[in-house]
């Protein structure tokens, strides 16, 4: 007769065996359905089953892997990522994949970034509260841009004076770290006003959350998904993410309490103003949706802070030996501000600056794919491409480097989009920094393209205007950028040092 322990062991063995057989059957079914789409990796059978070699190749060299995949099939190829196999469609599928029919962005993001784990909510907030986020950005944030042009200029000026200094002697700064602090200050001032914009700890936590959070996601990925609800309680990196969120709540709670008291009439003097706290509160009430105010604010940091910093850093690196371009950009800026003053209209007329920004984004987008989704029902696409339910899919951004679309696509040309605008009214319409086409997908494409790109554009112009007018900059002799490829992400040289010195600006900006 079997003992109780023997019975438990036998049941456990049956459960494990059943789980393994079920997973094997699912693996076989999936690969049978998707067999027509080639694998970009050149792997033997064992390396296809045990995916470590493939995921390492994906992590360090997706750009080359993408070239190999598209050479095998221009329509679609498969790649082994560190969170599962994914189908990458050619860039010409952007139009076909711009909607949500049979596709889910929110579910994909939650799975990729583990947004269902406690403490990781800022990674899934936008997907779980899509209407709330979209309305806040398009109806409230974008309408505040005229006011923010002045307010952010003041914050940028203050940050530069204290951190880049007013010394006219050449001195070195860690470029990425300095720009991160600058972007964080400008962003927090836009969303939460001067009180938190001058709170250094809040700024630090906003900058840290994405870095620590993404690090935790990568650390948890090797674990089987069914164990994550248990593992995250003990994993030190997951606990570090929760600690940051907890400290953010501690900073935010007294502010929220004062706002509530002011609205109830307990406190006559109210600090309530036109900030993102108001926007979320009012929009959420109008659509009948509950939300976490602290998570909502950190979501902005996750969505834009690091990508904007990366882009600004890359722009300055791209301009390192372009003294004539820098001089022309300064001249344009002086002419526009002298004529228009400092306002949203003036910023919209900085065409060379826009071309510079768009060209750096084209050359090095922070993400080499767009429209990442989970397929929620079997999909039949054009050219006989079949995507089975449950598969991961994305669209390649390769058209931004296609020589049939862009002349000398691997060469940086600061004037590229100015020249493109001169080709005719239609070209001019789609040559602006925030314009989106299937050939220019730096902000995504379709229903889930970045709704805050007008804000990003203005914030970057404010920052670049102050830097160009107030500072000379150069990089060490012989400097070669050392960017990092990390899967789909293309990251700028975060270790770059830049030499700067104060210059006498030709026109004064607010601040």
Swiss-Prot record:
It is found in: Membrane. GO terms for molecular function: heme binding; iron ion binding; monooxygenase activity; oxidoreductase activity, acting on paired donors, with incorporation or reduction of molecular oxygen. Its EC number is 1.-.-.-. It is a single-pass membrane protein. Keywords: Glycoprotein, Heme, Iron, Membrane, Metal-binding, Monooxygenase, Oxidoreductase, Transmembrane, Transmembrane helix. Pfam families: p450. Heme binds at residue 450. GO terms for biological process: secondary metabolic process. One of its GO terms (cellular component) is membrane. The chain crosses the membrane at residues 7-29. It comes from the Eukaryota. SUPFAM superfamilies: Cytochrome P450 (SSF48264). Glycans are attached at residues 64, 163, 343. Its cofactor is heme. InterPro entries: Cyt_P450, Cyt_P450_CS, Cyt_P450_E_grp-IV, Cyt_P450_sf. Pathway: Mycotoxin biosynthesis. PANTHER family: CYTOCHROME P450 (PTHR46206), CYTOCHROME P450 MONOOXYGENASE AUSG-RELATED (PTHR46206:SF2). Belongs to the cytochrome P450 family. Cytochrome P450 monooxygenase; part of the 2 gene clusters that mediate the biosynthesis of fusicoccins, diterpene glucosides that display phytohormone-like activity and function as potent activators of plasma membrane H(+)-ATPases in plants by modifying 14-3-3 proteins and cause the plant disease constriction canker. This is Fusicocca-1,10(14)-diene-8beta,16-diol C-9 hydroxylase.
């Amino acid at each position: 007769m079997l003992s109780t322990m023997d019975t438990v062991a036998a049941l456990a063995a049956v459960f494990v065996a059943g789980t393994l057989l079920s997973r094997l059957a699912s693996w076989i079914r999936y690969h049978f359905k998707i067999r027509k789409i080639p694998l970009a990796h050149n792997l033997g059978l064992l390396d296809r089953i045990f995916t470590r070699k493939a995921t390492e190749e994906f992590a360090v060299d997706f750009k080359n892997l993408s070239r190999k995949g598209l050479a095998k099939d221009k329509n679609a190829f498969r790649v082994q990522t560190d969170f599962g196999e994914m189908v990458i469609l050619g860039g010409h599928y952007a139009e076909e994949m711009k909607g949500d029919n049979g596709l889910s962005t929110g579910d994909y993001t939650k799975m990729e970034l583990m947004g269902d784990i406690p403490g990781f909510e800022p990674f899934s907030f936008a997907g779980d509260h899509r209407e709330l986020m979209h309305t806040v950005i398009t109806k409230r944030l974008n309408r505040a841009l005229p006011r923010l042009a002045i307010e952010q200029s003041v914050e940028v000026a203050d940050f530069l004076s204290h951190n880049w200094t007013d010394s006219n002697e050449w001195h070195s700064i860690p470029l990425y770290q300095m720009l991160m602090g600058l972007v964080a200050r400008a962003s927090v001032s836009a969303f939460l006003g001067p009180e938190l914009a001058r709170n250094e700890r809040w700024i630090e936590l906003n900058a840290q959350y994405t870095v620590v959070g993404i690090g935790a996601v990568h650390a948890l990925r090797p674990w089987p998904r069914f164990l994550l609800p248990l593992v995250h309680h003990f994993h030190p990196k997951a606990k570090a993410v929760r600690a940051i969120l907890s400290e953010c709540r501690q900073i935010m709670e007294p502010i929220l309490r004062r706002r509530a008291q002011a609205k109830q009439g307990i406190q006559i003097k109210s600090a309530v103003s036109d900030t993102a706290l108001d926007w979320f509160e009012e929009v959420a009430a109008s659509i009948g949706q509950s939300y976490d105010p602290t998570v909502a604010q950190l979501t902005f940091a996750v969505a834009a802070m690091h990508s904007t910093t990366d882009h600004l850093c890359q722009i300055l690196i791209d301009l390192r030996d372009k003294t004539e371009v820098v001089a022309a950009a300064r001249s344009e800026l002086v002419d526009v501000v002298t004529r228009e003053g400092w306002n949203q209209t003036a910023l919209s007329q900085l065409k060379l600056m826009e071309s510079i920004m768009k060209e750096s984004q084209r050359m090095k987008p922070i993400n080499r794919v767009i429209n990442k989704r989970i397929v929620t029902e079997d999909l039949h696409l054009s050219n006989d491409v079949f995507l089975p339910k449950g598969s991961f899919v994305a669209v390649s951004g390769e058209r931004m480097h296609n020589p049939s679309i862009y002349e000398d696509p691997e060469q940086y040309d600061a004037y590229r989009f100015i020249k493109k605008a001169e080709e005719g009214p239609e070209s001019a319409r789609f040559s602006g920094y925030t314009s989106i086409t299937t050939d220019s997908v730096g902000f995504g494409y379709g229903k889930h393209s970045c709704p805050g790109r007008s804000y990003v554009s203005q914030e970057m112009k404010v920052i670049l205007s102050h830097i160009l007018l107030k500072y000379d900059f150069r990089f060490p002799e012989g400097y070669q950028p050392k960017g990092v490829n990390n899967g789909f992400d293309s990251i700028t040289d975060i270790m770059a040092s830049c030499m700067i010195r104060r210059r006498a600006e030709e026109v004064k900006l607010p601040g």
